[in-house]
């Protein structure tokens, strides 16, 4: 009887093993078809199946290996949420809820914008980097940083670097992290500005989310406390009404003029909004928008995945375009190394390290939950990145370039734009551009850089294929814009608040009262500094002749990837101190790859002028030299002022790029020294800062 039972178990294991072998072969076949296909278009189902297979294998086997062979997660060990359960910051939470919270926090504009910009090089480079890079790098990054924070009482990334690498390194790293945070917030806000500029329908809808969120906050605070689902449903209904009302606002000439703003005006508005929102009580605006954006985000992404499977639209953008050489109009740089920093959050993101060492480690009820929350959430984010790539890829290539190319490249007139884009080898007529503009209810789609409009048009086209009625495209386009802007603005709110705390922490070392988090005046002062920091980059991006995204996104990518590299180095140091030298390779190898790519791209961004026009477009220093030459021959006063501003902006960007590289280099050198001492000399200094073992109740 026992023998029969054992044979049955062996048979079951064999069948499971065969099933996983089949999944691996199926994934390899689908990926091979995507890579070797030579036709004009290819069905997106090949991508859907390939990604499902690769993510399943990565989560089932690689994350399990990391969890129980490298990190050795222990559910008998109490987490910070259990040890310090205060009902406020530290609260043991069901892993499904924690997963939703963490995913909502990390899935910002990055996975939507990066792959859309990278589509100028074709679909294949992005697909390969997103699939392979996320499974072996990005998901690992989020998981291991979350583990490190759990074992250190839920401490932040900067605090952990200070504990594990020393006070001086921690202080410099904290400065670097703050600078990177400001760049991240600026680029998030830039995406919203580019989506809402000259769009009365879009601006009205987003403006209405503020009173809706305040109403939700008051309702939940004073009338129906803790009824999150109920108030979110009410908020969602009001949002749908706002979208419908926005259509009639855009059709009325007087109302349309009231709600139409250019990019620079919107930048000032978002700065003012970010300042006010970050000093208001969390329950009044931030929390209700967070609830609303979380439900909306998870719901829309889920529906989009199902819709893509159901419609199976063909990818029209080529497998590889001529712009892999870096001559493309959407962003500066060749496929190596700039594809990697452009896709950014869709594969690996340093910003996630701030979340994985922020609120999330204070919510985990068991250590094993970190596998689903850390690794699993990043799997979902990379799925979002693939969905964004699909939304860009199903568009006519000419239409894609009409939307994402800056005005300086294609001009203001539709006929001129169609002619220029056709000369690039992507034939499109002015009538096709005009028809899409009319279908989505906008006055223009030319040079709507930033990724959000492209994603929205792609989503609207998928819905159109389901319903077969082009009249629905306008509603769904603006619904997608609302969806993107809502959770991006929530990230701007939360990012400004987080950066304010970081500024106060740093200022407290200079003048102690400024570090008092309970001081209202100190909080306002720190918030002003924070908003001024990210607001500067936002405003300069709006007046940039190349659209801001062209120059700002690569700087964001470099800084964000350097932050990811520093976080992986921290975990490598921790694992070396724990004596897990072989296991440390799961973080050390991605760190080496990411930092190598990022240092190379960072160096290219500060190289002097050369005969290579592509490198000159990438380099801030080269641009400064070119602008200086123009300034010497310009007599027009207005043009001279514009050139002076541009020169100053490139100088700031170059200085920041060098600073971020120096910070990352310092962390790298100290990490190598600590790991070498641990491996060769068995010297652990600074000592491992892991909190003492406390048995779970």
Describe these PLM feature segments:
Residues 2-24, 57-112, 294, 334, ...:
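Membrane-interface "cap" regions at the ends of multi-pass membrane proteins
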Residues 2-5, 63-91, 117, 131, ...:
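Flexible loop linkers connecting adjacent transmembrane helices
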Residues 28-41, 112, 124, 182-198, ...:
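Transmembrane helix-loop junctions in multi-pass membrane proteins
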Residues 32-38, 43, 89-152, 163-167, ...:
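Membrane-interface helix-loop-helix modules in multi-pass membrane proteins
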Residues 41-60, 118-148, 158, 203-209, ...:
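Extracellular loop-to-transmembrane helix junctions
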Residues 45-53, 57-70, 176, 200-243, ...:
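Membrane-interface loop-to-helix entry segments
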Residues 164-182, 376-383, 449-451, 470-480, ...:
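Loop-to-transmembrane helix boundary motifs in multi-pass membrane proteins
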Residues 308-324, 379-457, 494, 536-547:
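Extracellular/periplasmic helix-exit of transmembrane alpha-helices
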